[in-house]
Swiss-Prot record:
Molecular-function GO terms, alphabetical: growth hormone activity; growth hormone receptor binding
A Pfam match: Hormone_1
Keyword field: Disulfide bond, Glycoprotein, Hormone, Secreted, Signal
Organism for this UniProt entry: Oryzias latipes
Protein name: Somatolactin
Keyword Glycoprotein: yes
Sugar attachment sites: 144
Family: Belongs to the somatotropin/prolactin family.
One GO term describing the cellular component: extracellular space
Subcellular location: Secreted
UniProt function note: Selectively regulates proliferation and morphogenesis of neural-crest derived pigment cells.
SUPFAM superfamilies: 4-helical cytokines
Keyword Signal (UniProt): yes
Leader sequence residues: 1-25
Length: 230
C-alpha cells in the first residue's frame, strides 16, 4: 500500500505542472476585468478549451475517488455504497441520465445543465477540503487534487457562462438549487459516517464530472456533424 501511494505521489509530481499549464487559458480572471479574456476568444476555441478543462476535471476527480477508496474504504463498505442509500447531491436537478434523453436536449439545455452541475459542486468541495483535514494519514496528493478540482470548477463555471453568452446570446439562468440548502453540513457525524459521506461525494463528483464532459462533447459534435452525434 505504501509503495503504491508513493508511486501515485510521483505521478502527481509529474502531472501537476501539466494540470496548471493546460488550465490557465480558461481562467477568465484577468486583473479587474473579470471575464475580459474569455470574450476575446472565438466561440470554437472557447468550446475546445472548456471541453479540455472538463476532461481534466473528470480525470483528476476519478483519481481522487480511487485514491480515497484505496486508503479509507474496505471492500464491504464499497459494496454497501454501490447498493444505494447514499444519494448524490445533484439527484434533484432536472438533468436526464439516459442516453436517449440526453440526445434530445437542446444546445441551450446542454449548456445550462453543465452550469448547474458545476455550480452545485462548488460548495460541497469546499466542505470536502475541510473534512479531509480530520483524517489521519490523508496523503497530500489527495488534498491537492481535491483543491485543484475545487479551483478549476470555478474557472470552468466562468468559461461556460461566457460560452452561453456567445452561443445563445443570453445570460445564464439563475438557479437557487444550492441556496435552498440542498447540501447540509452535519457536525455530529461519527467518523465512519464522515468517511462514507466523503466517499459518496467523491463518487458522485466523478459521475457528474463525466456527465459535464459528455454534454460538452455532444455540443461540440453538433457544431461539426449535427446528424451523426450518437
Amino acid at each position: 500500500m505504501h509503495t503504491k501511494v508513493l508511486q501515485q505521489g510521483l505521478w502527481a509530481l509529474l502531472l501537476w505542472p501539466h494540470l496548471f499549464t493546460v488550465s490557465v487559458p480558461l481562467d477568465c480572471r484577468d486583473d479587474q476585468a473579470s471575464l475580459a479574456r474569455c470574450p476575446s476568444i472565438s466561440q470554437e476555441k472557447l468550446l475546445d478549451r472548456v471541453i479540455h478543462h472538463a476532461e481534466l476535471i473528470y480525470r483528476v476527480s476519478e483519481e481522487s475517488c480511487s485514491l480515497f477508496e484505496e486508503m479509507f474504504i474496505p471492500l464491504p463498505l464499497r459494496l454497501q455504497s454501490n447498493q444505494g442509500g447514499y444519494a448524490c447531491i445533484t439527484k434533484a436537478l432536472p438533468i436526464p441520465s439516459s442516453k436517449s434523453e440526453i440526445q434530445q436536449l437542446s444546445d441551450k439545455w446542454l449548456l445550462h445543465s453543465v452550469l448547474m452541475l458545476v455550480q452545485s459542486w462548488i460548495e460541497p468541495l469546499v466542505y470536502l477540503q475541510m473534512t479531509l483535514d480530520r483524517y489521519d494519514h490523508a496523503p497530500d496528493m489527495l488534498l491537492n487534487k481535491t483543491k485543484w478540482v475545487s479551483e478549476k470548477l470555478i474557472s470552468l463555471e466562468q468559461g461556460v457562462v461566457v460560452l452561453i453568452k456567445k452561443m445563445l446570446d443570453e445570460g445564464a439562468m439563475t438557479t437557487t438549487y444550492s441556496e435552498q440548502g440542498a447540501f447540509q453540513y452535519d457536525v455530529q457525524l461519527e467518523m465512519l459516517e464522515y468517511v462514507m459521506r466523503d466517499y459518496t461525494l467523491l463518487t458522485c463528483l466523478k459521475k457528474d464530472a463525466h456527465k459535464m464532459e459528455t454534454f460538452l462533447k455532444l455540443l461540440k459534435c453538433r457544431q461539426t456533424d449535427k446528424y451523426n452525434c450518437a
